[in-house]
Curated annotation (Swiss-Prot):
UniProt-annotated location(s): Nucleus, Nucleolus; Cytoplasm
Residues that, per the record, bind Zn(2+) 4: C394, C397, H410, C417
Record-listed Zn(2+) 3 binding positions: C380, C383, H393, C400
Biased composition (Basic residues): 466-481, 497-506
UniProt-recorded name of the protein: rRNA N(6)-adenosine-methyltransferase ZCCHC4
Amino acid sequence: MAASRNGFEAVEAEGSAGCRGSSGMEVVLPLDPAVPAPLCPHGPTLLFVKVTQGKEETRRFYACSACRDRKDCNFFQWEDEKLSGARLAAREAHNRRCQPPLSRTQCVERYLKFIELPLTQRKFCQTCQQLLLPDDWGQHSEHQVLGNVSITQLRRPSQLLYPLENKKTNAQYLFADRSCQFLVDLLSALGFRRVLCVGTPRLHELIKLTASGDKKSNIKSLLLDIDFRYSQFYMEDSFCHYNMFNHHFFDGKTALEVCRAFLQEDKGEGIIMVTDPPFGGLVEPLAITFKKLIAMWKEGQSQDDSHKELPIFWIFPYFFESRICQFFPSFQMLDYQVDYDNHALYKHGKTGRKQSPVRIFTNIPPNKIILPTEEGYRFCSPCQRYVSLENQHCELCNSCTSKDGRKWNHCFLCKKCVKPSWIHCSICNHCAVPDHSCEGPKHGCFICGELDHKRSTCPNIATSKRANKAVRKQKQRKSNKMKMETTKGQSMNHTSATRRKKRRERAHQYLGS
């Protein structure tokens, strides 16, 4: 499931290596991990801080992990804010109201009853996106209802369900059949027997469909996805309602144990995780979640296998490469362009933006992964990997350097290959688009300005945090002083008013006497 924000450019700007605007939002780890984060309808919230270049950090706050738009989840709480019992009770009630109308057990029971119905009685409400039992028909008589739902249709729920379209929260861009079939064939060729599908519903259903139609295929799949609608199509051992931004299982320990058992089956052998997160999501919380899944997998490993890594395919735009490799240094990016059915830009060929920017990041050696030559991929002997047709090997860089599928040009001044549309700017002293602003947003670290790292990994971050803490304390003292002066002024005003009142009373008594 891939999500876009307000257009391709916004996502590319956020993911570009080292490219930082005048401000940004970062996820921070709480000082005391033992203190649980407050809950919103999507599980534990994340702690954020706004960072502005040249200015200090502002007050930290908790917000929803899954929703980038306050209209979708308006949770907001300052880190140091104390809530009353009434507000906490109201929040808990709101969180309960926002949960799916049916429990996981109820969904399974309804599904088992549904598949036993004759074809003429199998109905699906397209308005409510729900499988209907005969007792439900009356409540949906005014809705748009699809009849004669076949078993084949039940096995392809991603084609029955309308894709969620909120771009900032959970927009669903589903793998095109070409890319999905390539992934299934590749997983089979690499010898994997189990696939943990994190946010990849179409891959999950194609794996199950292939297994049901091909006796030679023994690949099993478990889907973890935030879209609870899939719970009505799968048994408990095939689907878990899950938020990948905070590692939250909506159905609690039962679902967690399903995932754990799947990861640790056969002592963790023969499994791979394939994930397709929303592109608008922050890389850091995703990396933290994936490391928790890796740790769960490692629990089933013997001491001799402690050096092994869980094989992973992380499907994401190529301009997030530096961010992903920051958290997973063993990952490499493949040239394969992943397509999506319902996205006008993320498509293979020349119908999309500059062909699909979506790639596969993996810790599997690239020389083991064969890309389809009929789609224009070729093997580069010096690089020992498959590359796209126009990705030419650069002798100076000793690499096939293109990231976007076009032929890149080597810049002798920058000492690296750059996009064909870029030119070298003598003012900026690096290559950039021809119409760029030389006085535009600076690149690099917010703290020291260096280009080779982010603020979170800056060697000067401790000094910066001490300075920020001192500034916050100074601001707090100033705020407290202003409050005291205001209170003092109000007290003095009250005293003066009391004195005036007493003087008037004495004057009235004097005049009356």
